[in-house]
Every structure is written in structure tokens, then in C-alpha cells.
UniProtKB/Swiss-Prot annotation:
It is a peripheral membrane protein. It catalyses: a quinone + NADH + 5 H(+)(in) = a quinol + NAD(+) + 4 H(+)(out). InterPro entries: NADH_DH_suC, NADH_quin_OxRdtase_su_C/D-like, NADH_UbQ_OxRdtase_30kDa_su, NADH_UbQ_OxRdtase_CS. NDH-1 is composed of 14 different subunits. Subunits NuoB, C, D, E, F, and G constitute the peripheral sector of the complex. Belongs to the complex I 30 kDa subunit family. This is NADH-quinone oxidoreductase subunit C. GO terms for molecular function: NADH dehydrogenase (ubiquinone) activity; NADH:ubiquinone reductase (non-electrogenic) activity; quinone binding. Pfam families: Complex1_30kDa. Signal peptide: none annotated. It comes from Neorickettsia sennetsu (strain ATCC VR-367 / Miyayama) (Ehrlichia sennetsu). The keyword Lipid metabolism does not apply. GO terms for cellular component: plasma membrane. NDH-1 shuttles electrons from NADH, via FMN and iron-sulfur (Fe-S) centers, to quinones in the respiratory chain. The immediate electron acceptor for the enzyme in this species is believed to be ubiquinone. Couples the redox reaction to proton translocation (for every two electrons transferred, four hydrogen ions are translocated across the cytoplasmic membrane), and thus conserves the redox energy in a proton gradient. Its main location: membrane.
Length: 186
């Protein structure tokens, strides 16, 4: 198996730990290769919203090699409005649930997923609640109406259109959260 090194950037930041930045095109091949190299357990897939980036969502895959006590973090950046992430369900079946959660919270579409639908929020939920520009109150209020004996959805009056995340503070680390899997120094 040959992985195009122009599409993968790796960093070993501690003994037994590595971070790999991948392109969308190489992702499934890379995950499959790592699986055949002993990383037999996919422990999590999650998203991080970097509002200021062009490709604002970073999808992170955490792989574990129990025999050699190694961990590998694979990252791929995506613009959920225009790009789809290839599913890894063919390599790790547990990816099914993790990918559904990332879709539900961040709106990232996983191409080829066998059952991509919401898993944590209501099926009529609008938007993706973990995005930094999602309103704190949501778009609709859901409540049970005793008179009609049914669930009622009511539009919420948004008093705050947009939250600004720029912070002029002297405190270290407030402007940019630290990422234990990031090899860059502050």
C-alpha cells in the first residue's frame, strides 16, 4: 500500500503517540493502513469548529494499539458546506455511531455512510448545535402542550444575532485553546 506523502503530514510528539494530518482523498486508505499496522481500535471520532478557518471543521480520529501501547490521532479539515468526508465504516464498524454524532452536532456529511441520520437531537431539529455561530437559544423551542396533548415547536425570538469570539485579554491561552494533539507551540 502506498500513501501519497504530499497528502499526509505526520508528527510524532511523544513516545508512542503520533499526529497525522490527512487530505480527504487519503483518509480511508490511511485509516486502513494504520489498522493493518496494529491500530486495531477506533476509540473516537469528533469534530472541532475553528470558526476563523476556511475549512472550519476539523474531524479527528483517535486510534489505539493496545499491544504496543501506541496512540495515533488522524486529523482532516473540511468545509461542511461544500465537502464530504469519506466514511470509515468499512474499516471500523464502530465508526457508524461516531460519524452520525459528528454529522448531528457539526453538519459534516460522511459520503458512503450506511445510515447517516441524527443520533442525539430530535429529527426535526434545525441546525447543528456545536457550531460556534449556532445561537445559544437554538431556533425553536420544543415543549409539550397539555391542552392539545402533543409536542409543539415554536420559533424562538433571537435577541442576539451573532456572538463575537475575539477576546482582548492578557491571560495566556484564552485566545487560542491548547490542543494536546497539536504539535505547534504557542
Amino acid at each position: 500500500m502506498t500513501i501519497d506523502t504530499t497528502e499526509v503530514d505526520a508528527l510524532i510528539n511523544a513516545p508512542g503517540r503520533c499526529v497525522v494530518n490527512s487530505s480527504l482523498e487519503s483518509l480511508v486508505e490511511l485509516i486502513s493502513h494504520l489498522s493493518s499496522c496494529g491500530f486495531e481500535q477506533l476509540t473516537d471520532i469528533f469534530g472541532i469548529d475553528y470558526l476563523e478557518r476556511e475549512k472550519r471543521i476539523e474531524v479527528v480520529y483517535l486510534l489505539l494499539d493496545l499491544k504496543r501501547n501506541r496512540r495515533c490521532c488522524v486529523k482532516v479539515s473540511v468545509d461542511p458546506a461544500s465537502e464530504k468526508v469519506p466514511t470509515c465504516c468499512g474499516v471500523f464498524s464502530v465508526a457508524n455511531w461516531f460519524e452520525r454524532e459528528v454529522y448531528d452536532m457539526y453538519g459534516v456529511v460522511f459520503e458512503g455512510h450506511p445510515d447517516l441520520r441524527r443520533i442525539l437531537t430530535d429529527y426535526e431539529f434545525e441546525g447543528f448545535p456545536m457550531l460556534k455561530d449556532f445561537p445559544l437559544t437554538g431556533y425553536k423551542e420544543v415543549r409539550y402542550d397539555l391542552e392539545s396533548k402533543e409536542v409543539v415547536y415554536e420559533k424562538v425570538d433571537l435577541s442576539q444575532d451573532y456572538r463575537s469570539f475575539d477576546s482582548l485579554t492578557p491571560w495566556k491561552g484564552v485566545g487560542r485553546p491548547s490542543d494536546p494533539f497539536d504539535g505547534r507551540k504557542e
